[in-house]
């Protein structure tokens, strides 16, 4: 039993849950670090180190985010990569605040009824692939705000793909969960299978085709991907497999540069991602509801958890009115409501401290989309520029399809769209949301919630999480733990979490032992109180993986603030800094 296990064994109730920190010092060497010049928190320590190396070389947070994100796509290809997309939130020391939407788009030939009577084709295979945006997004942010040469930022990932990387325990778990699909795909089999069996943790994995692709991108930038050899080969592979993406789809792809959502809550200003992210507005709505109870007492203990669950249910009722604002103009009004303190006040008045209600009480008209996967990174540099980026290919290994000629694992982002269903279904299941129906060039709704926290205009934190539909609740709880409940950064991330998506009407709570032998569980005393209030609870083995960096003033360092960076132990990652 390692020291982290003993840490997790003794739990004390805070809001969410637990602080689990009896023996934190032994863990802090890995999961939590203190740095003064710059810090990088990703869900894989190799990529955190690559990001820090970029900072040491004179790069800024934007440079480091490019190198770290590309690294994650190589060593953690079940979660993200250049075959997917991303949302990136940036706050610069000069005052600039900007959001980059490089979410995947529906192909130009896509239609809302393209899956007919076979919705499984929306989940995996060539028809589930959206037009990738990550390369364009990274390059656009770097062009506008980066310092180091582009090629220098791509080379570490290229080297990893060429020379090989060790399969982590977490990646092996993802491989095992999709074993039959990997064995059925030629490209994935070449990467992850040896002698008819999945490669084991610690085995070396090489992706020479991806190394070649990254070499092209390093030399020619996104042109290679969107209008060059890489793009031509990628489209050819997709079409051979029956997909509809064309070179014109790639050529037409564009990054949306947006103004972040912004709201003041209890003295802090939050920057969040606007739609097609539902995460930014939903997190702000939840926090605005909970802030009215008073902190920390109003959001502490079992009652605080009940109030959180109820706020989540209200937020998810509103969430499915959101969609791509370029196609659904009324989304702007929905977001205005979600950021309104008066709207939050009205919802808070509907929360009953003694009981919960069925989904209809919360007013949700539409069914929920269950997005998956993702990877999150947080970076703050010596100038206190901050980047919070969540990237994704959606489900484990996306479309379960690796392009043989490029080495790219392709996303299954089309599964994040809603599709019409025939009438006559379960009367308790709401219909799919028209705001999220497929249209050519449209971006599907997402739960990704990259967040930056400011105080008096200065960066105080960068945070976010991976975990698909659970991301909103997971990111919100980490924020609550630190900023509402005054838990230290490591405790804020380690505390077990609870989730609710309104439909089904169940609260999912962590009760699992990770592949690293760490156990996470909502305490029984909290569960008993919730059940007495009518909450239906179900245990889950998983949830969200959070990366948090907090800026703290430190009287011992001559006025230089320190950075406390935490990578979630649930995925075995660790932060890096100097």
From Swiss-Prot:
Annotated glycosylation sites: 94, 176, 227, 511
Binding site for L-glutamate: 103, 392, 394, 413, 416, 446-447, 467-468
Inducing or repressing factors: By glutathione.
Reactions catalysed, as given in the entry: an N-terminal (5-L-glutamyl)-[peptide] + an alpha-amino acid = 5-L-glutamyl amino acid + an N-terminal L-alpha-aminoacyl-[peptide]; glutathione + H2O = L-cysteinylglycine + L-glutamate; an S-substituted glutathione + H2O = an S-substituted L-cysteinylglycine + L-glutamate
Record-linked Pfam families: G_glu_transpept (PF01019)
Keyword Glycoprotein: yes
Single GO cellular component term: apoplast
Biological processes annotated in GO: glutathione catabolic process; glutathione transmembrane transport
Function, in words: May be required for glutathione transport into developing seeds.
Protein name in the entry: Glutathione hydrolase 2
């Amino acid at each position: 039993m390692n020291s982290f296990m003993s840490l997790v064994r003794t739990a004390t109730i805070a809001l969410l849950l637990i602080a689990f920190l009896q023996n934190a010092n032994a863990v802090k060497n890995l999961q939590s670090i203190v740095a003064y010049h710059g810090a990088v928190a990703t869900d894989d320590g190799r990529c955190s180190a690559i990001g820090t190396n970029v900072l040491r070389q004179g790069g800024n947070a934007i440079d480091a985010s490019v190198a770290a994100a590309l690294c994650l796509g190589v060593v953690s290809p079940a979660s993200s990569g250049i075959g997917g997309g991303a949302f990136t939130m940036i706050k610069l020391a000069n005052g600039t605040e900007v959001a980059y939407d490089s979410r995947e788009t529906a192909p130009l030939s896509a239609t809302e009824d393209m899956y007919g009577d076979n919705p499984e084709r929306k989940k995996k295979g060539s028809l589930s692939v959206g037009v990738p945006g990550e390369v364009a997004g990274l390059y656009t942010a770097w062009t506008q705000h980066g310092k180091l040469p582009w090629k220098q930022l791509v080379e570490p990932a290229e080297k990893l793909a060429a020379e090989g990387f060790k399969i982590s325990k977490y990646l092996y778990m993802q491989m095992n969960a999709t074993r039959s699909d990997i064995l059925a795909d030629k490209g994935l089999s070449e990467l992850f299978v040896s002698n008819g069996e999945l490669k084991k943790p610690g085995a070396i994995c090489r992706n020479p085709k991806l190394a070649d692709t990254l070499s092209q991108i390093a030399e020619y930038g996104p042109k290679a991907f969107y209008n060059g050899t890489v793009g031509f080969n990628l489209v050819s592979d997709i079409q051979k497999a029956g997909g509809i993406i064309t070179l014109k789809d790639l050529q037409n792809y564009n990054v949306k540069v947006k103004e972040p959502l912004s709201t003041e809550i209890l003295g802090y200003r939050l920057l969040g991602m606007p739609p097609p992210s539902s995460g930014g507005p939903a997190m702000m709505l939840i926090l605005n509801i909970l802030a009215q109870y008073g902190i920390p007492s109003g959001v502490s203990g079992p009652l605080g958890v009940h109030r959180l669950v109820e706020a989540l249910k209200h937020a998810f009722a509103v969430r499915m009115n959101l969609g791509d604002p370029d196609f659904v103009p009324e989304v702007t009004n929905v977001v205005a409501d979600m950021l309104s303190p008066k709207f939050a006040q009205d919802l808070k008045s509907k929360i009953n401290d003694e009981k919960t209600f069925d989904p209809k009480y919360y007013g949700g008209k539409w069914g929920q989309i269950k997005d998956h996967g993702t990877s999150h990174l947080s970076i703050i540099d010596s100038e206190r520029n901050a980047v919070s980026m969540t990237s994704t290919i959606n489900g484990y290994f996306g479309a379960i399809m690796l392009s043989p000629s490029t080495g790219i694992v392709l996303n299954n982002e089309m599964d994040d769209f809603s599709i019409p269903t025939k009438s006559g279904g379960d009367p308790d299941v709401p219909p799919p949301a028209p705001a999220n129906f497929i249209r050519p060039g449209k971006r599907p709704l997402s739960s990704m919630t990259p967040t930056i926290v400011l105080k008096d205009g200065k960066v105080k934190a960068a945070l976010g999480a991976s975990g698909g539909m659970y991301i909103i609740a997971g990111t919100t709880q980490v924020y609550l733990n630190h900023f509402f409940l005054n838990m230290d950064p490591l405790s804020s991330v380690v505390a077990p979490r609870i989730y609710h998506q309104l439909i089904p009407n169940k609260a999912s709570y962590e009760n699992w032992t990770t592949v690293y032998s760490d156990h996470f569980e909502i305490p029984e005393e909290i569960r008993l109180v919730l059940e007495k209030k009518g909450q239906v609870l179900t245990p889950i083995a998983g949830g969200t993986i959070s990366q948090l960096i907090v800026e703290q003033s430190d009287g011992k360092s001559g006025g230089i603030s320190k950075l406390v960076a935490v990578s979630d132990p649930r995925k075995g990652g660790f932060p890096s800094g100097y």
